[in-house]
Amino acid sequence: MSTPKTYYFYLWRHRFVDDVTDKIIARTCFGITSNPPNRIHGYEGHVGHVVKFAKLWTGSERLIRELETRIKSDFFQHTVVGTDGFRYEWIDESVSFESIVGWVNWEIENTFIGITEVKEVK
């Protein structure tokens, strides 16, 4: 019998200069992975600099996938829409990072018991 694969839910804060307004914008990316280092390498390849997850939680694949589904639903109106109306796993700058972390912590404490925070994010 194989042991279940550990999954992770992450938040990553990304700041960039908007090409239209020339203002600095901070958005929160969210997602899941079974291999945080590989996921980080993927982001670094896209953005061209070192990436570090701001928050990372771990749990069973089922719980982590359900948490991701919940955040997509609850924050749907705040997800970033790109070319051709494609929605990304980015929460726009109208929602503070602290609010998102508070939401995740509440969901874990009240709905997704079994998910734990990774205290040292590498």
Which positions does each model-derived feature cover?
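Non-catalytic accessory segments flanking enzymatic or RNA/DNA-binding domains
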Residues: 1-122
